[in-house]
UniProtKB/Swiss-Prot annotation:
Stated role: The GPIb-V-IX complex functions as the vWF receptor and mediates vWF-dependent platelet adhesion to blood vessels. The adhesion of platelets to injured vascular surfaces in the arterial circulation is a critical initiating event in hemostasis.
Tissue spec. comment: Platelets and megakaryocytes.
Signal peptide from the UniProt entry: 1-16
Single GO cellular component term: glycoprotein Ib-IX-V complex
InterPro entries: Cys-rich_flank_reg_C, Leu-rich_rpt, Leu-rich_rpt_typical-subtyp, LRFN, LRR_dom_sf
Encoding gene per record: GP5
Coiled-coil zones: none
Protein name per the record: Platelet glycoprotein V
Keywords of the record: Blood coagulation, Cell adhesion, Glycoprotein, Hemostasis, Leucine-rich repeat, Membrane, Repeat, Signal, Transmembrane, Transmembrane helix
């Protein structure tokens, strides 16, 4: 017992002794070496001890990784050769690395790998071959890697994968195939990956998602298909993925989606569909998704939305349907069921009008963006009962007027953007102008709302207009005036209308008559002038006489 204890202690002390570190390397930790520079073909000449467990090589010169580079390193567990110029790996290079758990050959120039290169690494758990120039992979390359959990083949030039390539990788949890030239995935390619959690296939050239391709991936939580050329998705493609929480389908060529495509995706918390040429959405698309908080449908070809299209997304907080010029109308209940929605982005579309109850039931809405549309008017009750609303963006539309109480009963409102509209500063704007003058702090000063007309008021900020005018005509227009023979009446051209300090007075009709006798008027006018002159002379004469008399009295009193 004592002999065994002493033997273990001696072996431990021997192992704890630092090994001689090669001159071109750094050995900060025991059993670990970090080397940079030098020639790839002369790694064996570095004199690395065979009892190392970690080796990091980077910045190596161009060359072929030789078979004797790691001879005798039977206890090595982590080998990382990255950011170098390795063009190829000789057969048998890793034959002695029987305990290796991590192999990283990232960011090199490797174009091909020998078929049996990895056969001795049965304990390998992580394999990173990303950022190389691989054009193809032998179908038997990974057959012995039964313990592999992470495989990165991203950022290569792969355009084809053998159907049996991953057959024995039953413990795989991460598979990254992004950034390649793949156009399709063969049937059965992912049939053995029941434990796979993350599948990254974005930035390829895939044209379709075929039926059954993903059926074996019951543990999958993240699926990335964005930046492909996908035109079609098989109905029920995601039905067998009960744990899926993140799905990206943005930046593809999808013109339509199968009905009920996401009906069984109850655990989704992230779904992207933006930048697809979607022409319409099916009436039933989403199932109950209690965890989905964001949905973006930007840059599509949608013309409208189905009524209650999002009714099952009860926990949605952010919804964006933007940058879709063909979107010109929305149904009454487009956002029904979104009681938790906080941000609604509808900017940069082609909306010309909005239904009265579009925002009904969105009691927690804080921000709504309707900027850069073609809106000419808003319903009076559009923002009614939105007590949490803080920001409303209506700039860059074609608004001419708004109801005076359109923003009434919004206690938390802090911002209203109204610039770059076609404000018609006539009498009809009066009620809204009254509200605006009481809430100038809410309107952005960088792009203030300005009058588009009429006349001299064009270009003036709304709040710079003068106050109320008693002559502003009522809703039914100005009172009728007695007119001469109707045949002699002719309306004055708007350019000849009288100027006024108020923006709406110009709209009052002005008429002229032909052959009217104004001589009585002028006679009376001159008579008044004559009378006024006579009265003025009499007053001046009387004041002079009074002044003289006053001075005479003063002198007499002074002498007496």
């Amino acid at each position: 017992m004592l002999r065994g204890t002493l033997l273990c202690a001696v072996l431990g002390l021997l192992r704890a002794q630092p090994f001689p570190c090669p001159p071109a390397c750094k050995c900060v930790f025991r059993d670990a070496a970090q080397c940079s520079g030098g020639d790839v073909a002369r790694i064996s000449a570095l004199g690395l001890p065979t009892n190392l467990t970690h080796i990091l090589l980077f910045g190596m010169g161009r060359g072929v990784l030789q078979s004797q580079s790691f001879s005798g390193m039977t206890v090595l567990q982590r080998l990382m050769i990255s950011d170098s110029h390795i063009s190829a790996v000789a057969p048998g290079t890793f034959s002695d690395l029987i305990k290796l758990k991590t192999l990283r050959l990232s960011r090199n120039k490797i174009t091909h790998l020998p078929g049996a290169l990895l056969d001795k690494m049965v304990l390998l758990e992580q394999l990173f071959l990303d950022h190389n120039a691989l054009r193809g992979i032998d179908q038997n390359m990974f057959q012995k890697l039964v313990n592999l959990q992470e495989l990165a083949l991203n950022q290569n030039q792969l355009d084809f994968l053998p159907a049996s390539l991953f057959t024995n990788l039953e413990n795989l949890k991460l598979l990254d195939l992004s950034g390649n030239n793949l156009t399709h995935l063969p049937k059965g390619l992912l049939g053995a990956q029941a434990k796979l959690e993350r599948l990254l296939l974005h930035s390829n050239r895939l044209v379709s998602l075929d039926s059954g391709l993903l059926n074996s991936l019951g543990a999958l939580t993240e699926l990335q298909f964005h930046r492909n050329h996908i035109r079609s998705i098989a109905p029920g493609a995601f039905d067998r993925l009960p744990n899926l929480s993140s799905l990206t389908l943005s930046r593809n060529h999808l013109a339509f989606l199968p009905s009920a495509l996401f009906l069984h995706s109850h655990n989704l918390t992230l779904l992207t569909l933006f930048e697809n040429p979607l022409a319409e959405l099916p009436g039933v698309l989403f199932g109950e998704m209690g965890g989905l908080q964001e949905l973006w449908l930007n840059r599509t070809q949608l013309r409208t939305l189905p009524a209650a299209a999002f009714r099952n997304l009860s926990r949605l907080r952010y919804l964006g349907v933007t940058l879709s010029p063909r979107l010109s109308a929305l149904p009454q209940g487009a956002f029904q069921g979104l009681g938790e929605l906080q941000v609604l982005a509808l900017h940069s579309n082609g909306l010309t009008a909005l239904p009265d109850g579009l925002l009904r039931g969105l009691g927690k809405l804080r921000q709504v963006s309707l900027r850069r549309n073609r809106l000419r008017a808003l319903p009076r009750a559009l923002f009614r009962n939105l007590s949490s609303l803080e920001s409303v963006q209506l700039d860059h539309n074609q608004l001419e007027t708004l109801p005076g109480d359109v923003f009434g009963a919004l206690p938390r409102l802090t911002e209203v953007l109204l610039g770059h509209n076609s404000w018609r500063c006539d009498c009809g704007l009066g009620p809204f102008l009254g509200w605006l003058r009481q809430h100038l702090g809410l309107v952005g000063g960088e792009e203030p709302p300005r009058c588009a007309g009429p006349g001299a008021h064009a270009g003036l900020p709304l709040w710079a207009l003068p106050g109320g005018d008693a002559e502003c005509p009522g809703p039914r227009g100005p009172p009728p005036r007695p007119a001469a023979d109707s045949s002699s009446e002719a309306p004055v051209h708007p350019a000849l209308a009288p100027n006024s300090s108020e923006p709406w007075v110009w709209a009052q009709p002005v008429t002229t008559g032909k052959g009217q006798d104004h001589s009585p008027f002028w006679g009376f006018y001159f008579l008044l002038l004559a009378v006024q002159a006579m009265i003025t002379v009499i007053i001046v004469f009387a004041m002079i006489k009074i002044g003289q008399l006053f001075r005479k009295l003063i002198r007499e009193r002074a002498l007496g």
